[in-house]
Amino acid sequence: MKRFILAILVCVSMCIGVVGCGSEAVATDIQNRRIDYGSSERAASVSNSNLKEDSSVIAVGKTTVSYKEYKTYYYFMKNQYESILGTDIWKYNKAVKDKSVGQEAIESVLRQIIQVKVIGKEAAIEKVQLATDEKEEADYRAKTVFDSIPAKDKQTQGIELKVLSKIFEENKLAQKMYNVQMGKLKIDYAANTLSAAKVELIYQAANAKNKETVKNTMSRILSEVTSSQNSFYTVAKNKTQADAIEYVIGNQDSRTNLAKAVVSLKKNQTSTLIEEKDGFYIAHCIQTNSASLQQQYRNQLVSEKQTESFQKTYKTWSDKFDVKVSKALLAAN
């Protein structure tokens, strides 16, 4: 159930995508404790020491978030980390910027809360509200989750049904705002005009300075792929710099050299070395173009366009409000 609520609460974050709060300024917000967008709505004051349950720890314009509300969000995030990685995870520091996992979790929760508050404020401007049945559904889910929380946790973490219901309602409203924006978006991709292939990729980034070095490295990897008894996937797992290995790539991809090479591959065929603006690729085809793959590729394109569109829309919303975050909150963990 703890992971169930988190899945509900991160829905908006997934819609907004990898940009966090909708702009690079959000990361700066977390580090500098304050964003000033030069907007008309200045951020309210927040408490920077001796936090109590009713202390304001986040301000998005005049809208504030209490320490109690923040702790409710954080409770579910913390439990998800621990259910997967164990309680010792909080002791470790990441290599990047020497942040602890606890600090990363705090920043993740802060971004999520700021997103929801920004979208909620824009919903008020646009007069978008939850219908009665939508509010009842959010409250029912909040009650279901609340009843599943151990009494000890409710007491020690100060979790209240009223606060949890508010969180669920605001997240549902944020999802509704996303759906409203997507309803305005016109995307026209006819599946039968698309060509795509499912491939395994090896990718290494390159720039003007290291281009030749990376090219030579990838040439050696290509030789390894063609001569090794190991599968392409096994080699890719150890050599790629991409986040994943398997991708669906088609003729609408902005990486035109890669797209052209991929859609021309036969099943189980490996490409030559492919140069793109961002680096070098080697592709291995595991499924050639078909009606089902065209539809999958279309859905992928639509999802990408939706995310891109909402990121831009959210950026215009977030620019309307100053944001402040409690220094005491950021200093925790």
Model-derived regions, located:
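Short acidic alpha-helix initiation/capping motifs at coil-to-helix transition points
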Residues: 50, 112-116
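Short, low-structural-confidence N-terminal segments
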Residues: 1-103, 312-333
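PPIase-associated folding chaperone regions across multiple families
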Residues: 23-53, 136, 150-216, 220, ...
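Acidic helix-start/capping segments at beta-turn-to-alpha-helix junctions
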Residues: 91-101, 114, 120, 129-150, ...
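Surface-exposed patches in mature extracellular/periplasmic domains of secreted proteins
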Residues: 127-134, 231-236, 271-273
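Short, structured surface segments that line ligand/substrate-binding pockets
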Residues: 112, 123-124, 276, 287
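Second-shell loop/turn segments in exported
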Residues: 55-63, 95-110, 119-129, 154-164, ...
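Peptidyl-prolyl cis-trans isomerase
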Residues: 220-258, 287, 291-293
